């Protein structure tokens, strides 16, 4: 993991998404203000090849909810209000600034990171890779180019469920840290040995486990091969003691402030 004496690191999952609209600059800034050690976000390619920060293939919770990200230019995506839904859904947390939130580019997020006082904050960038190898390679190349442009090789971890995409990142720039994502769906069909072998084969530095499958057995197996372990998505502070006992290096959470209280 990025050099740190703190364990576990607290990472804002899609920003401080429990208290701000997910994957927005407001959510990322809130996570930093709340004391998070970093943020996690999702990236896809817009029609013009620009990496934009959004989880779904379409734009949910907006009047343009059927618009496909891959078929829309980034400048058009940056005009779409993706914050107002949060104010309507969570009136007690509503803020005027959320009505001005639009889909950010990955470049926007890296610029926000550069403006933070701490130069140790990190970003987990999840590649939302599909089945098309060519498109996945284009996404990986675009992310690597941005990481290099902002000189963030030591502060970014590129992660994905698509382990071919993880391997591509390492092929393009071996200095960028990578992580292999595994959830209950993968655990249902893979043994501990198969999960660890798949992570190693991808060249990953880290294994990111859904909290339901983060057992001592699999964590110990990963540590034996010097793989760093992160767990997602945990909003219960009682998990911190377990994380420390299992030597988990990072926790992805929707609510950094709650985990740090």
Question: What is each PLM-predicted segment?
Answer:
Residues 1-12:
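N-terminal amphipathic alpha-helix/helix-capping segment at the start of soluble metabolic enzymes
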Residues 17-22:
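Active-site metal-coordination segments of metallo-dependent hydrolases
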Residues 25, 29, 33, 103-114, ...:
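Amphipathic, non-transmembrane alpha-helical secondary structure
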Residues 30-45, 199-207:
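Catalytic domains of carbohydrate-active enzymes, especially glycoside hydrolases
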Residues 55-186, 202-205, 209-211, 223-225:
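Metal-dependent phosphodiesterase/phospholipase catalytic core, i.e.
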Residues 180-261:
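C-terminal active-site rim and adjoining tail of enzyme catalytic domains
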